[in-house]
Amino acid sequence: MSKYIGIFVFVFSLFSLGVHAGESFRFRVYLKDKGDSGYTLDNPEEYLSKESVERRNRQGISVSESDLPIAQAYLDTLSANGGKPVLESKWFSTVVVSSPDSLVAERLSRLPIVDSVKWVWKGDEEIDIPREEKDTTRFMPIDKPEKSPYGYAEEQIKMLNGIKLHEAGFKGEGMRVAVVDAGFMNVDRISVFDSLRLLGTHNVVFPGRSVFIGDDHGTKVLSCLAADAPGLMVGTAPQAEYWLIKSEDSRSEFPIEEDYWTAAMEFADS
């Protein structure tokens, strides 16, 4: 009998703490302001890249308060109260925090720096099955070249009237493009991307993990832009430079998708 009482007490404790084995919770914390980060509008190069500053100067876009980062002291306060910061938005003054305790939201909402707290996700933190990196397989085209140099992209580029732009010399040279999508599976192995001008990758959803595994929707989108295999497929901007940013967890649909997308936009803009 005592054994069953012990089990009951343990299970009751889990539910009373808002904890479910194997689950984690994420909450969007709306801050009342961003605090004093130590940065100023007079020195944007301290928190924006050189390219971002130059683009703003070229396009007449002024640096504003929305560009200033959230104060580290605010992030530390959230962390000290049980919410581990995993995403932040300087544009909206929000921070997404992670915790195994669903009741952390109530504690955070009482902090003087916090305006409100919203639940945005729950699930297992560990996911993703990593690709076997020892596999160096290259994916070569099996299709026969088409008569048109644009190959399978001919109808698309005709529809966009892009051939005239290419004939005039506009193929994306000197432009930087951020492709924000759910994943770019095998872009690093598909031969039509051998000439891809890749500036870098960024994984908003699973920081530090490759964007070249998992979902392939971004691969398809990128092929319409950057593929450069005459006779097979030539995209609309094969000479542009690209950032590939993973911003979606395709396993599920939760409000945190808004935070992922915002983080991707802010990364690209900065």
Model-assigned labels for residue ranges:
Residues 261-270:
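Hydrophobic, small-residue-rich alpha-helical packing segments that form membrane-like cores
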Residues 1-24:
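Bacterial Sec-dependent N-terminal signal peptides
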Residues 86, 108, 169, 234-236, ...:
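A general structural signal for stabilizing positions within well-ordered secondary structure
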Residues 110-175, 188-192:
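Protease zymogen maturation seam
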Residues 64-71, 101, 155-158, 214-218, ...:
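Solvent-exposed, acidic/flexible segments
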Residues 21-138:
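Inhibitory N-terminal propeptides of secreted protease zymogens
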Residues 22-24, 40, 153, 163-258:
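Subtilisin-like serine protease catalytic core
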Residues 10, 101-103, 161-165, 227-229, ...:
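Short alpha-helical segments and helix-capping/turn motifs at coil-helix boundaries
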